Amino acid sequence: EAVSQALLGGDFNMGQFLLQVVCIVLGVELLAALVLFLHDPVFFSPFSALFHAVSAFCNAGFALAPDNMVAFREDGLVCTVICICIVLGGIGFGVLRECLGILSRGRLAPVTRLSRLSRLVINTSLFLIVAGALLIFVVEWRRAGNEDLVGDGLHLFLISLFHSISARTAGFNMVDMANWSHASLMVLMVLMFIGGGPGSCAGGIKIVTFRLLVGYVVAQVRGDRQIVFHKRGVPPENLTPVSYTHL
């Protein structure tokens, strides 16, 4: 219902929405491809740069190198560009459309002016990204036997952050995953299971479903009759497998 309300409101126009989606996709992918090409024109030829930009934004996780993105594990710019594309592609076109609509008014509006759905998706995404990165960093830092993660703390956290973002929606890797501990792999699997936002390029059960499941467990423990998100309740009858599928 939240997704439908956000996308199919009274002023919704399908043609305008599709045009905005196309503009967002082309704009992000072309800009990312240009940055990659200017940064390293040897590896990122025009085709290679565009391929990796599209692969990142569409959360495909495909790379042209046989070892995926391992060669760029110490390249902060490439890591940042790929991460931004993954996040934007996995947050949902409805959320992106709403954020761009606010920014296009010529001033930065407070976060509270976003819809409840957008705030829920953005806040949960940020939490999962940071929490996943911290867990991987703590587990893998200075762990004996993992030569891929030998270096200063900032570099290790950047790799942890990259994989926290990539695992949930895309699948790129900058290190040999065979060297990771079982604890880190479990963190990655949980992030893969959750996935991205509704109406996005990402897979998984989706962020809204994850929040509903967590909220349902918390409500049962507290003895509450309904889940409350941002001062609004979710009726128990909406917590069905059908609802989970649609979300």
Predicted regions and their residues:
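Membrane-proximal intracellular helices of multi-pass ion channels
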Residues: 1-247
